């Protein structure tokens, strides 16, 4: 009974304190009108500065940016003011409106900070599509809570607490239905700046935003330097929306069986050279790149003996043929290279989306696997990671794969190397599927072992840790090819890397190599190895091509013209 009275007394005390605070806040609203107006007027400038400061890190850099780009800063403040006005009209409460906008701005700012520090790519609106894969993304990211970040968040919280205490708010007791329309109008104006080209183009021109087209990551990063975080986020959002495919005026839906007309329903054995249907294995190795293209520059930085890390790759190349091809991405967006391999179609033809596979969700597609399927092949997709990432299981099920194997589906013993499933496990799974298939096998594998982060390893240098993983992967590849050489089944193996790795932002190896938009072409070229065990004529294989042309060449290489 005493305890019950104690709880009641405690609750009464808290309630009395809350009432006292509320009375004081109501008094402050009336007592300090000028202070409250100043808080309301300063807030848009404050939150813009905090969001940008979180990227610039030091106040001096923010001041320099404002002095060099005053019109862009004005644009940011006006957008923040429109959002704040809209929220204020909807909620009336100044501090609560500030809380909502601050959470949005600082959440985006922190996400941008972590993303750039992770892979050197800046946050864009289309990245929001990956929000459902937050768990996967956090496993990649270099998330470091620094004292500076804590300080900036504390300053934001302090401003909101100040507003809570002085309690600025709309004085007039206007009913919500009368505030709703102007409040929504303010928010809709902000949305229109991003989504409506007729609005965004003159607005961006007026405030002198950098709107040049960016066909590689380094040009995009230069736009970030010119626009700052907030203007960059909005302008690239507008750009991505304007690049969406428009349905032609005379477009008509295909019939249910339309795709079949492009695919032969039955291909006679005589259509294949010597009547042989070989297994076709595509291995797209995550972040596998040959840094020997920068050997001279790396030696000057103290990185020597690169050949030892690539001995397995050189051995595999000596067993087949090798060349270079152009990939559509750098440091991230594996699905762009994967899309070109699975469709034989350049992402540029779809206006260069970051996640092209999401544009083809509604039906079966005429993919490379579907061609093999029509020729009597068994088809398989192997990816040793979560099936939900990039919605692969849901989307790729339309690509005519008979079997899809993700991290929980392996039928061979699973081990890890670094953070992820060992590439040798993938190689073992490939050999197992070849052995168990009664039909010729087409298989596409996208590995995971060499994905970031590279902070864990024998060295404090993430680049050396990356090279150690590459060495392990390349040695395993050479060993697998030796196994397949001894097998009786005719087999083709195409080994490629999807893109150069994500090696931090400001202090990564790319900055040390002084890579810019003018000299970054090597980062969009990848090595390929084509191997077979049945003396296929590969004398006319291209040594330098786009990835989709390379896949098409392999597709028809062993068939009669």
Predicted regions and their residues:
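Short alpha-helical interface patches
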Residues: 119, 127-140, 147-151, 236, ...
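Alpha-helix initiation and N-capping motif
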Residues: 128-131, 226-229, 238, 256, ...
């Amino acid at each position: 009974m005493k305890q019950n009275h104690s709880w009641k007394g405690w609750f009464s005390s808290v309630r009395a304190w809350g009432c006292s605070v509320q009375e004081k806040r109501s008094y402050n609203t009336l007592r300090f009108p000028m202070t409250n107006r100043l808080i309301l007027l300063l807030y848009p400038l404050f939150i813009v500065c905090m969001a940008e400061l979180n990227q610039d890190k030091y106040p001096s850099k923010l001041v320099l940016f404002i002095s060099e780009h005053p019109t862009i800063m004005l644009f940011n403040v006006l957008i923040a003011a429109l959002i704040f006005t809209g929220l204020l009209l909807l909620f009336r409460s100044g501090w609560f409106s500030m809380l909502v906008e601050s959470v949005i701005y600082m959440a985006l700012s922190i996400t941008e900070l972590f993303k750039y520090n992770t892979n050197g790519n800046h946050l864009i609106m289309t990245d929001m599509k990956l929000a459902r894969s937050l768990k996967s993304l956090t496993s990649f990211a270099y998330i470091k809570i620094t004292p500076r970040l804590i300080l900036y968040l504390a300053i934001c919280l302090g401003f909101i607490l100040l507003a809570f205490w002085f309690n600025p708010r709309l004085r007039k007791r206007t009913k919500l239905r009368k505030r709703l329309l102007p409040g929504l109008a303010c928010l809709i104006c902000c949305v229109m700046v991003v989504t409506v080209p007729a609005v965004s183009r003159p607005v961006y021109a007026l405030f002198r935003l950098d709107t040049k087209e960016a066909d590689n990551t380094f040009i995009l990063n230069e736009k970030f330097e010119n626009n700052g975080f907030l203007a960059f986020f909005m302008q690239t959002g507008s750009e991505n929306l304007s690049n969406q495919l428009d349905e032609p005026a005379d477009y008509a839906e295909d019939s249910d069986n339309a795709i079949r007309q492009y695919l032969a329903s039955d291909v006679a054995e005589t259509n294949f050279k010597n009547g042989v249907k070989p297994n076709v294995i595509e291995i797209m190795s995550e972040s596998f790149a040959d840094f020997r293209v920068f050997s001279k520059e790396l030696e000057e930085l103290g990185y020597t003996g690169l050949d030892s890390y690539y001995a397995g790759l050189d051995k595999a190349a000596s067993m087949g043929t090798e060349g270079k091809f152009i990939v559509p991405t750098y440091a991230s967006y594996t699905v762009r290279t994967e899309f070109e391999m699975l469709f034989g179609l350049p992402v540029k033809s779809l206006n260069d989306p970051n996640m092209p596979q999401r544009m083809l969700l509604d039906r079966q597609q005429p993919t490379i696997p579907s061609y093999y399927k029509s020729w009597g092949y068994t088809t398989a997709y192997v990816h040793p990671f979560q099936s939900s990432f990039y919605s692969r299981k849901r989307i790729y099920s339309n690509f005519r794969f008979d079997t899809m194997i993700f991290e929980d589906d392996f039928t061979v013993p699973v081990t890890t190397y670094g953070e992820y499933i060992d590439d040798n496990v993938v190689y073992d799974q490939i050999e197992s599927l070849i052995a168990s298939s009664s039909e010729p096998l087409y298989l596409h594998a996208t590995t995971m072992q060499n994905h970031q982060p590279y902070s864990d390893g024998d060295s404090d240098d993430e680049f050396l840790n990356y090279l150690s993983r590459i060495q392990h992967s390349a040695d395993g590849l050479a060993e697998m090819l030796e196994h397949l050489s001894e097998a009786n089944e005719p087999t083709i193996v195409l080994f490629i890397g999807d893109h150069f790795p994500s090696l931090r932002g400001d202090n990564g190896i790319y900055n040390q190599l002084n890579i810019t938009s003018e000299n970054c072409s090597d980062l969009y070229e990848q090595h390929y190895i084509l191997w077979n065990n049945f003396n296929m004529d590969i004398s006319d294989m291209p040594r330098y091509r786009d990835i989709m042309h390379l896949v098409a060449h392999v597709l028809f290489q062993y068939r009669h013209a």
